[in-house]
Structures are given as structure tokens and as C-alpha cells.
Design a protein with these regions (language model features):
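Rossmann-like dinucleotide-binding domain for NAD(H)/NADP(H)
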Residues: 2, 11-13, 17-103
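Short alpha-helical donor nucleotide-sugar binding micro-motif in glycosyltransferases
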Residues: 5
Length: 103
């Protein structure tokens, strides 16, 4: 959402590895290009593969922009790690513990 992006700190780095549509891609491009946020790291897009006229292509060469293809999920090791993390999270929850907190 454009308003949320506008409220970010100037040194904030937005990472989107969820879904491309979660973020307003055009607003992110504007915020990075105008140096209103520190940068972005993205491996999910509203349309894949990225077309030459996709908004991210305007900022792709900037040092504070990291655009990667969304391929990590396919690896066997990634699926094993996901299951292991899920089990650890469930065990921690059942024990009343907190994991992976960002405060």
C-alpha cells in the first residue's frame, strides 16, 4: 500500500518473499528511486518472469536493490528446512516459548 510505504523510515529495507501482490510494486519503485526508503530485496512478483517493461526493471541496477528469481522453494533442502522450522515452531508454541521474534 502506497501510504504504508510512504510511512517507512528512510533507511528501511523492505524484503518481500511472500507474494508479489503483497506490495505496491510501482510505489516501491518510486520510493527507492526517490531515496525515500533504503532499498528493497524481492524474489516474488505480480507477474513472472519479469518483463522488460516491469517497474522493477527501472531500478534493477541500483546497489540498494536485490531482485532474484523465485526458485528457492523448489530445492529439496529448502523443503526439509521448512518442515524442520515448522516442527520447531510448534514445539516452542506448545512449550510457551517464543521463536523468531522481531520487536
Amino acid at each position: 500500500d502506497r501510504n504504508l510505504i510512504a510511512s517507512m523510515k528512510r533507511n528501511a529495507i523492505l524484503i518481500n518473499v511472500a507474494r508479489g501482490a503483497v506490495c505496491d510494486e510501482e510505489a516501491l519503485v518510486e520510493a527507492v528511486a526517490q531515496k525515500r526508503i533504503g532499498g528493497i530485496g524481492v524474489d516474488v512478483y505480480t507477474s513472472e518472469p519479469l518483463a522488460a517493461d516491469h517497474p522493477y526493471m527501472r531500478i534493477a541496477g541500483l546497489p540498494n536493490v536485490c531482485l532474484t528469481p523465485h526458485m528457492a522453494w523448489g530445492a529439496y533442502e529448502a523443503r526439509v528446512r521448512c518442515v524442520n522450522e515448522m516442527v520447531a515452531n510448534i514445539r516452542a508454541f506448545c512449550a510457551g516459548e517464543r521463536r523468531n521474534r522481531v520487536d
